[in-house]
Amino acid sequence: MSFWRKRIGTLRAGMVVAGILLLASLASYGQQTIRMSLADGFDFPVGKPNGAGYYIARGLRLTSPIHFGEDWNGRNGGDTDLGDPVYTVADGVVTWAYNVRAGWGNVVIIRHAYRDPATNQVKFIDSLYGHLLEMKVKPGQAVKRGALIGTIGSNSGMYPAHLHFEMRHNLKIGMHRESVARDLTNWASPSDFIKKHRQLNREWNQVAAPAGTYPVYQGFKGI
């Protein structure tokens, strides 16, 4: 009798675990929401707040050869910026913070809500910080503009040290950049966007931002 009780207990535990895994799987596809504050402005991700001491070695290019963001380097060249601080460009919530290896290394993605001055509508945008030496944040963490989120890296020596920085209007990209059209409806020119949104009105109310929008990532995902 005790044998069957143990078997039933084991089966129940297995069903609970399976249920949790199923819910987690569904959540990765679902269109949940997260509460977040509206950004009161955007700053540059290095040399805060104005990018002092850094330059853009390579910018956004949506035609061949494709480059989906900006590469920020320290003005002293080489690996002199290795380990330099990287900051979030605006208030937001971390949606991704993993080591995905390959050509990326450590990657942080943060979702931001802001009121568009041109339309007065609340909009959302993702910022991505790639090749980091260290990550200082975790998924689900709320961050304030200028908060330390990581340090400049080289993807374990694959590249000279630099920050790969992207901003995306399309919230469904995640780590699947080839899944959407190469145009400015999906991608933002990072520096242009920041310059146009340096100072926004402070609003104390929070908004519901889309969450769970990224396709499931099948590659390596470490912390």
Q: Which residues make up each language-model segment?
A:
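A residue-level detector for short acidic-glycine micro-motifs
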Residues: 96, 131-134, 151-154
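Short histidine-centered loop motifs in beta-beta connectors
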Residues: 80-82, 87, 116-146
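Bacterial N-terminal signal peptides
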Residues: 14-25
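Active-site loop architecture of trypsin-fold serine endopeptidases
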Residues: 152-164
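Short peripheral tails and domain-boundary helices/loops at the edges of structured domains
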Residues: 120-127, 168-198
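Short edge-strand/loop segments of extracellular domains
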Residues: 112-117, 172
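N-terminal secretory signal peptides that target proteins for export/translocation
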Residues: 1-9
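Surface-exposed, glycine-biased beta-strand/turn segments
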Residues: 26-106, 115, 145, 154, ...
